[in-house]
């Protein structure tokens, strides 16, 4: 039987636009902690709290974005969200020394990012054939991973001369190119869900997929160590005395993400959804363990610490790359097609909550030492593995629609 076509023009354009969105995002992820401390004079212990306001904003907008994307044409919601996301980057060029202005801008940026990623994630599912959804999500995620490989390293290279203005200009130009790509995407027509049909206009299940609550809890716990890693690994490497370019960590991590996505999506299409997720968490667990032990290993041997540094990145990347397409498919399979955006919003909400917890508590625990915040991430991932295998798997098999 001939496979349905995956690589349509619109699918390719959405993937490229996603790469440029993620690249602009990852330019700022490892560099903003340095920006807050060196340019705005923020104390190290407060960095996590200031950065987490972005995630809180994303979290607040996700359910509404999912509802709107289910009700109105997704292409229009996608374009408006992309425009707002691009506009936020203009604001960074206007900040000089105001912490309050930074917080307001990050909240606005978070709202735009939450709406854009929720809609884009749903739009790409609409475009790809359902028989190749796992594979399509895997390749789509590779774009994010390529951005992770190049974005942090590029951002850290730009600020090595202390030029934060150039950093923000590069991010702005990148997102404007992505916006141009998004304008050309042709979205398939869908049946618009009437506001007054079947359910009240305002009801909780319009904003959140109740069948996905257990999986959402697991997703939240999985995201905690990921949020800690992306926010504090560069600073952690500096603290333990590693002399290598800390941006290379994200490159190696992205390599693991890419390699795993290239085959895990195909396994998902064959029906191994929960099995793939469990294996991915188990692999990622060893990566976070390596991060936790990095401080102690560096005290004995810098060479051994360098090896552990990159090994942890590879294991983290491979584990999470295995998890992502399977988890996304799990949520979509729990919802009817008319609530696909709501399912994606629930999936991403769990991720955002975990990232926010990681950024916030990671920043607070870093005052005692970064090894403690990575140890916290390790415990959360262990909980996620046990909870998923003992409960979420049974719940999914009972309530799945496809």
Language-model-detected regions and their locations in the chain:
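Juxtamembrane intracellular "pre-TM" segments in multi-pass secondary transporters
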Residues: 1-8, 187-215
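Helix-loop boundary and gating motifs at the non-cytosolic
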Residues: 10-48, 223-236, 240
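Residue-level signature of mid-helix packing/kink "hotspots" within the transmembrane helices
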Residues: 55-63, 148-149, 254-258, 262, ...
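Conserved MFS/SLC helix-loop-helix module at the cytosolic interface between two early adjacent transmembrane helices
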Residues: 60-96
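Helix-to-loop junctions at the C-terminal end of transmembrane segments
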Residues: 62-73, 260-272
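Structural signature of the two symmetry-related core transmembrane helices
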Residues: 76-90, 275-290
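Cytoplasmic helix-loop-helix junction between adjacent transmembrane helices
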Residues: 107-143
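C-terminal membrane-cytosol helix-exit motif in multi-pass small-molecule transporters
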Residues: 173-193, 387-392
């Amino acid at each position: 039987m001939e496979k349905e076509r995956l690589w349509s023009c619109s699918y390719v354009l959405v993937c490229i636009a996603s790469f440029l969105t993620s690249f602009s995002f990852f330019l700022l992820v490892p560099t903003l902690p340095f920006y807050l401390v060196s340019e705005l004079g923020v104390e190290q212990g407060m960095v996590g709290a200031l950065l987490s306001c972005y995630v809180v904003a994303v979290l607040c907008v996700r359910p509404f974005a999912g509802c709107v994307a289910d009700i109105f044409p997704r292409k229009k919601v996608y374009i408006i969200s992309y425009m707002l996301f691009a506009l936020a980057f203009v604001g960074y060029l206007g900040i000089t020394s105001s912490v309050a202005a930074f917080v307001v801008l990050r909240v606005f940026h978070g709202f735009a990012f939450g709406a854009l990623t929720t809609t884009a994630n749903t739009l790409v599912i609409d475009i790809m054939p359902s028989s190749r959804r796992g594979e399509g999500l895997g390749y789509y995620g590779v774009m994010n991973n390529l951005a992770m490989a190049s974005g942090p390293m590029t951002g850290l290279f730009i600020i090595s001369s202390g030029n934060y203005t150039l950093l923000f200009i590069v991010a702005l130009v990148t997102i404007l190119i992505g916006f141009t790509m998004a304008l050309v995407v042709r979205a398939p027509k869908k049946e618009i869900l009437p506001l007054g049909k079947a359910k009240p206009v305002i009801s909780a299940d319009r904003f959140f997929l109740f069948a996905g609550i257990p999986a959402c809890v697991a997703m939240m716990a999985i995201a905690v160590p990921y949020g800690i890693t992306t926010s504090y690994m560069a600073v952690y490497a500096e603290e333990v005395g590693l002399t290598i370019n800390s941006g290379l960590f994200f490159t190696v991590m992205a390599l693991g993400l890419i390699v795993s996505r290239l085959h895990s999506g195909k396994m998902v299409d064959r029906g191994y959804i929960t099995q793939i997720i469990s294996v991915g968490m188990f692999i990622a667990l060893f990566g976070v363990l390596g991060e936790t032990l990095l401080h102690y290993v560096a005290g004995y041997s810098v060479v051994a610490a360098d090896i552990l540094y990159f090994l942890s990145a590879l294991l983290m990347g491979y584990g999470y790359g295995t998890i992502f397409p399977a988890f996304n498919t799990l949520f979509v399979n729990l919802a009817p097609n008319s609530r696909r955006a709501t399912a994606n919003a629930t999936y991403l909400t769990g991720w955002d909550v975990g990232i926010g917890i990681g950024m916030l508590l990671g920043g607070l625990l870093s005052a005692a030492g970064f090894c403690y915040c990575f140890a916290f991430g390790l415990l959360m991932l262990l909980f996620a593995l046990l909870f998923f295998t003992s409960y979420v798997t049974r719940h999914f098999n009972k309530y799945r629609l496809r």
